[in-house]
Amino acid sequence: MQKAELGINLENVIILKGATSTNSDPRRMERFNAFRADVLKNAQFVNGTATMNIPGEPLRFRNNNISIPGKNSELKQTITIGNIDEGFIETYDLKLLAGSNFGISRQLDSAKVIVSESAAKIFGFSTPSEAIDQQIILDNVTRTIIGVVNDFHQEGLKKPLEPMLFTHEHPFEFGLYSMRFKGNVDEAMKHIESIWPKHYPNDPLDYFLCNDFFNKQYNEEKRLNKILTMFTLFAIIVASLGLFGMISFFAQQ
C-alpha cells in the first residue's frame, strides 16, 4: 500500500509491543523517552513514537462534545481522538501543513492539540494556517490548536477518511512503540534487542512490521474473494453438468 494512497508511510516501521511492567509506573513516559533515545543513537533509526493504536486498527476514542468559542452550538460531527507524542508525525512521515509539532513535555502541551486538515475545516477554518492558535472546547476544557497535519487513512482505503484530533498523551496502558528505520530490518532489530533488557528487564521483546500488520486486512479479503470465486466456479460447473444431462436426456427421447 502506497503512502500516496494512504497519506501515511507504513514502510520500514517496526512495532514493539509495549512493556506491561510499566502500566502502574508514573514515570513510564520518561522510561520510554530514555529507551527511544537509546534506539536513536543508532544511525539506522529515524524516530519513534508510543501510541495506544497503530495504523490498521481503529482509534478507540470518538467525541462530539466539541465546540468553538464564539459559536452557539456544538459540532454535529464526531471527531476521532488520538493520543500521540512528539515523535508520531516524523515516524509516520505525515505532513505538517501549518503550525508546529508537540514538544517533549506532556505537561506543557496538556492544553494543546493537533488536528487533521478535514477536522480544521469542520471547525470552520478555511485553511490550515487559519486554524493555528485558535481555540476549541473539548469536554469543557479549552484547548489551543498548534498544528494541522494532512488527512490519512487510519484503517484502510475502504474506510472513509475521518477527521482527527490529537492530544499529547502517553498510552495509559502499555501501548505500542513504533520505530522508523532505514536499511535492513534484521540489523535494526539487533540494535533494539541489545538495549531492550536495559530498559525493560521484566518484559519480553515482541515485534512485527507495521506494513505487514496493516496489509492483513487485505490478505483476509483476498482469501474470502478466492473462496467465493471457487464456490462460483463450482456452481457454474454443477449447473453446466445439469444442463448437459438434461440436453442428453431429451436427445435420447
Question: For the regions a protein language model found, what residue spans apply to each?
Answer:
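N-terminal membrane-entry
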Residues: N219-A235
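Alpha-helical transmembrane segments
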Residues: M1-N12, S248
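Intracellular coupling helices
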Residues: L241-Q253
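Residue-level recognition of transmembrane alpha-helices
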Residues: E117, L209, L228-F231, L241
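Flexible acidic/glycine-rich loop/turn elements at helix↔coil and beta-strand↔loop transitions
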Residues: E5-G7, R28, P171
